[in-house]
């Protein structure tokens, strides 16, 4: 499904509640294997930019793209005026450098070089001022090819096309030895003048001539020979020659000019326009006003052009991948109109391809993906048979079909080959500076990148087959972090995970992005703490939580030390409880459910372990029109759907063995409460200390497990009725947010300890609560979300 369609869906979520909305209020998909692993059986997202980049690998133009420092550091969000200024600055800088070189090489010989350079600089400044909206006449210059070029440039900026053309044509009439530096520039600009005059055949000739002159040895300091491909492509497109424009845009892209990704959309006859985007035809608002007759004529025009495209190998490939990149998957119901539009477009293209009776179809596997996306698996197999079968896309499609046939082993082996090709193929690796390609490969979250989906599929297959360590390896190296974390925390044994982490190569932290090795080490450290393997855990925790662990372990030991007094032991248990409550996420929190450290505890994550144990997942119930229904509270009604990728008996056994205890969100709060109750057991009845400790334990657990909270309240009722805090609790019939002698001391000690080890105070919403010292039984919500 296209990213644009998903964007529409996201905008409309509040109205139609589509996509991965869970009963918890968590919006996804953020976990690839969620929703019963349906992604593993579904079609991956195809990206226009990535696919045309793959096709461009078949083109090998000899020219080199010249990229200025400013262009390399361009910000996609900056205003067009700022980008234009950067281009102008680069032209000015290059012009000045070329003039200096011409003087040094004695290609021009002014009597006063310094004066000539100053005149040249002033002329360039005049051109820049004119370009910025302040018309400025050219000053007198030393007579040379540079001055001749400037005359044409000044006329061009004033939109005096005839004068500009005459100036540059006169420049090209000079002897070759007198125009080494501005021959290519003049030819290129003559092409742009012809575009302005709508003389597209002449423009085409000049852009071709630009490349010929650069190849002949004339200076091309701005890389205009490379740039000419895109402009010539535009000239051919203006002449309605898509079969000529497409390879020119492809050469432009092959040279590294990503703007060709947008230009190539112009050669797609039936591309749907989108509001707010660059469209090559009538805008959406205009189309909405069309009569039925106008719509019929447009469809006829599109069909005729598609038939022409079907006969051209390159255009045929482009139309196919464009349909894939914009298709709406059948299991998404954003609007019925969008769904029908996707199906009709695909069906029309299939009919045209079949009518063309072609002897050979390049990239037939991509036609297979269109069929697969529509649920026509027989058709997908047909197109797959017509393909060479050795591309990543072909192998991936084959693996999907094998999975549907229940051939898990074959599907896993085939998918493994597909992923390996993606790792090594130039078509699926980014050139330096191609952030857009990197995103299409590895994007995660609201949509999945191509390579991310491949890793997710292979990881899911490995998991379903019981290849647990291999599943972790694929998901981890594919940077599907939440999925890898699930396997690491809930499927692997602790020793298996430790062995895997210890075998990771020592690498420098990445300059950008997340350090996944570090994240996995920290995940292991917290799991070891949950397993009470404190000595092992210390080296894996992120500093300074290794020091927090030391303090926590000492408190546990002191609490259990019967040689100490009851008061000393109680203090120790309460210190351990305080640390478990307020540093519990960092010490022992789970990366995924139930604690959601991956989301900083701010959102409840889908419980993949529960889902895979049950063999089903919950999703919103839609009717045939794609509408959701709601209960009396306004929540969408859910339905249970059988999992696509079912867990093996071996996996279920491990999921049961590796349960989080207690399996409750922020489970460490229950641990903190239990530790506090150990302290309470050592304190005398009806002391303010015991009331304080039990009340704190109740405050920590009351929103997590009401039954446990009720048990703690009974202790207040039986042991603390004569205390101020106990009386406040009894008056409220529940716990109160109130400070006592020990909680005040622990809070102060905790803050001092954090300062000592260099931990910044947490955000206000997550800080240790300022407990009320007043005995009044007023309630307040627990201030910490964790």
Please place each PLM-identified region on the residue numbering.
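Short glycine/serine/threonine/alanine-rich loop segments
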Residues: 199
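Bacterial N-terminal signal peptides
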Residues: 9-19
């Amino acid at each position: 499904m296209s990213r644009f369609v998903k964007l529409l869906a996201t905008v409309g979520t509040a109205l139609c509640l589509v996509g991965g909305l869970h009963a918890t209020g968590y919006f996804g998909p953020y976990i690839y294997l969620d929703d019963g692993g349906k992604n593993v059986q579904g079609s991956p997202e195809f990206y226009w930019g990535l696919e045309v980049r793959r096709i461009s690998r078949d083109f090998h133009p000899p020219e080199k793209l010249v990229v200025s420092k400013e262009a390399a550091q361009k910000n996609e969000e900056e205003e067009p005026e700022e980008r234009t200024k950067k281009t102008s600055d680069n032209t000015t800088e290059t012009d000045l450098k070329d003039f200096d070189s011409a003087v040094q090489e004695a290609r021009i010989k002014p009597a006063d070089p310094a004066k000539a350079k100053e005149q040249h600089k002033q002329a360039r400044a005049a051109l820049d001022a004119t370009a910025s909206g302040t018309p400025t006449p050219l000053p007198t210059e030393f007579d040379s090819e540079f001055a001749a070029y400037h005359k044409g440039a000044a006329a061009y900026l004033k939109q005096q096309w005839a004068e500009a053309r005459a100036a540059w044509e006169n420049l090209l009439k000079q002897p070759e030895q007198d125009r080494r530096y501005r021959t290519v520039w003049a030819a290129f600009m003559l092409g742009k003048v012809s575009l302005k005059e709508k003389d597209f055949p002449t423009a085409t000739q000049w852009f071709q001539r630009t490349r010929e002159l650069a190849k002949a040895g004339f200076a091309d300091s701005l890389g205009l020979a490379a740039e000419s491909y895109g402009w010539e492509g535009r000239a051919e497109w203006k002449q309605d020659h898509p079969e000529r424009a497409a390879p020119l845009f492809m050469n432009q892209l092959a040279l590294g000019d990503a703007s060709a990704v947008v230009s190539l959309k112009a050669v797609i006859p039936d591309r749907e326009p989108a509001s707010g985007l660059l469209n090559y035809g009538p805008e959406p608002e205009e189309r909405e006003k069309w009569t039925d007759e106008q719509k019929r004529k447009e469809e006829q025009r599109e069909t005729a052009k598609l038939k022409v495209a079907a006969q051209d190998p390159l255009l045929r490939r482009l139309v196919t991948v464009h349909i894939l990149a914009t298709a709406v998957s059948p299991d998404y119901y954003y609007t019925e109109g969008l769904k029908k539009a996707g199906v009709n477009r695909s069906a029309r293209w299939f009919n045209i391809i079949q009518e063309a009776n072609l002897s050979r179809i390049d990239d037939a596997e991509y036609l297979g993906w269109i069929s697969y996306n529509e649920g026509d698996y027989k058709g997908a197999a047909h197109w797959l048979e017509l393909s060479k079968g050795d591309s990543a896309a072909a192998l991936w499609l084959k693996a999907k079909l094998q999975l549907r046939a229940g051939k898990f082993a074959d599907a896993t082996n085939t998918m493994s080959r597909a992923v390996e090709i993606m790792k090594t193929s130039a078509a699926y690796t980014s050139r330096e500076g191609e952030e857009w390609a990197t995103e299409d490969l590895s994007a995660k979250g609201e949509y999945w990148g191509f390579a991310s989906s491949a890793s997710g599929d292979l990881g899911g297959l490995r998991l379903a087959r019981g290849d647990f360590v291999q599943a972790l390896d694929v998901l981890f190296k594919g940077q599907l972090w939440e999925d890898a974390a699930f396997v690491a925390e809930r499927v692997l044994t602790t020793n298996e995970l430790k062995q895997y982490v210890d075998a990771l190569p020592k690498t420098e932290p990445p300059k950008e992005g997340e350090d996944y090795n570090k994240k996995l080490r920290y995940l292991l450290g917290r799991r070891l703490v949950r397993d009470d393997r404190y000595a092992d855990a210390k080296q894996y925790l992120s500093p300074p939580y290794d020091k927090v662990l030391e303090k926590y372990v000492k408190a546990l030991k002191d609490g259990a030390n019967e040689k100490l007094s009851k008061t000393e032991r109680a203090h120790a248990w309460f210190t351990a409880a305080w640390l478990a409550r307020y540093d519990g996420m960092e010490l022992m929190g789970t990366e995924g459910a139930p604690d959601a450290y991956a989301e900083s505890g701010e959102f409840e994550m889908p419980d993949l372990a529960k889902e895979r144990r049950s063999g089903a997942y919950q999703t919103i119930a839609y009717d045939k029109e794609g509408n959701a229904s709601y209960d009396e509270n306004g929540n969408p009604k859910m339905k249970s759907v059988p999992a696509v990728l079912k867990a093996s008996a071996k996996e279920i056994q491990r999921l049961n063995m590796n349960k989080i205890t207690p399996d409750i969100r922020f489970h460490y709060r229950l641990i903190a409460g239990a530790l506090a109750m150990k302290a309470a057991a050592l304190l005398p009845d009806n002391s303010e200390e015991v009331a304080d400790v039990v009340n704190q334990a109740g405050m920590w657990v009351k929103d997590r497990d009401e039954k446990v909270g009720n048990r703690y309240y009974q202790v207040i009722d039986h042991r603390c009725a004569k205390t101020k805090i106990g009386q406040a609790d009894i008056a409220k019939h529940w716990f109160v947010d109130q400070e006592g002698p020990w909680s005040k001391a622990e809070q102060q000690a905790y803050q001092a300890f954090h300062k000592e080890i260099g931990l910044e105070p947490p955000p206000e919403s997550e800080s240790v609560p300022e407990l009320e010292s007043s005995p009044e039984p007023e309630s307040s919500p627990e201030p910490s979300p964790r």
